[in-house]
């Protein structure tokens, strides 16, 4: 087994015996085989694009199946086998349309489904590239492929909402093809990684456009953290479209719907809240706490995307997955006439007790996306000019189980009272319910949204830079980023593409980044690891 794609890799050096995420070596091998087949499909897709043959089916499939290979998404070996079979079907269909061409061995690769796909996957592990490549090029290849996985996930969600851009699909397919090239040097691979970052910026823009055109621009909204009496369904993940579909199917059933994890920002979308008043509150915190939180939740639970952990027996019967998410023997929701059928979830929720007690009211506020913040840009600019606001800190990203992630809580607690904290993604659950007060009517803690709402953070940063007529690196903003999985890698590549400097990254640096690549990032972008809250705060504030 070889996997270095997440922050919690074994001993910080990669998983080689069993995945820290809970993924077995067998599942990992079949997952690697899928990625290998996708690399072969990509070469055919690019030829088809040159010939003006439609590749939309292949592009969408590539995004979904890459999404499935991300950390904490799919643990089901059978599902990966299905993806491989479908990959080959799409590939051969495109080849038939292209006619007789001289295809590479990879484009003609055919696994033997009568023999172990595990052993065949082990034969095409990414680790084998390391044995024949320069370590630094291998490092950047891993950066590119892990970044493309994150890019594919955002592209998948944007496409669900009717937002697509062929140039994004092109970058995904070109990057997959590049993995098997041996003629590219270090500078070429730096350029490829930055191109992934540029495409990811476009994908996040498309997703933002899909969300806001469908559900309205987020507005500041108070979200209850205490449940109300009655039957309940909990929805976790990132997929707001599937949350909306569930809300439509649960209307007038008496069931209350709660968000979990990265779906907290859904409460800020006005059209969603106005149309579905039974979208009531938020339950729980970040993904790594789900085994305790799901066990206590007295209703049905739906996982729309990552992060799924290996489920415990005491709640697996009420857990449902959909889309790219999967786990062997766990209920899977099927698509009927192009839409997910949530009736099994509704039936399960109605069979369970639901909440029978209420607790003391608590709430948090969401909805501070770019439209909201930039609408008060004059207030922000004046407060900065008058010295009432000294500095902005973006403290956010992924959460995880490591104790050293307490750094982010302590950092926010130590931020001076004349500074504002922007946050996003599940890293916010370390401090999302803290009462930090306000400056000039502006909350000192603003939740920008999901991880893909890094787009909002970028829009806000560029807006402030424009207001002061300076570069984005000259505004009083520091990026204190926590990472865990491949979406965070894609976002980091986007920030580097934009030339953003002095990013502090933690809690540890990626295992796939070689010493020389790290030195390049440090020298070029001043990318640096977090140290202690006190030291980093002092350095940021000068």
Swiss-Prot record:
This is Hydroxylamine reductase. SUPFAM superfamilies: Prismane protein-like (SSF56821). The modification Cysteine persulfide is found at residue 398. GO terms for cellular component: cytoplasm. Belongs to the HCP family. Hybrid [4Fe-2O-2S] cluster binds at residues 238, 262, 307, 398, 426, 451, 485, 487. It is found in: Cytoplasm. Keywords: 4Fe-4S, Cytoplasm, Iron, Iron-sulfur, Metal-binding, Oxidoreductase. It catalyses: A + NH4(+) + H2O = hydroxylamine + AH2 + H(+). The lineage of its organism: Bacteria, Bacillati, Cyanobacteriota, Cyanophyceae, Oscillatoriophycideae. Binds 1 [4Fe-4S] cluster. The keyword Metal-binding applies. GO terms for biological process: response to hydrogen peroxide. Disulfide bonds: none annotated. PANTHER family: HYDROXYLAMINE REDUCTASE. Its main location: cytoplasm. The gene is hcp. Its cofactor is [4Fe-4S] cluster; hybrid [4Fe-2O-2S] cluster. Coiled coil: none annotated.
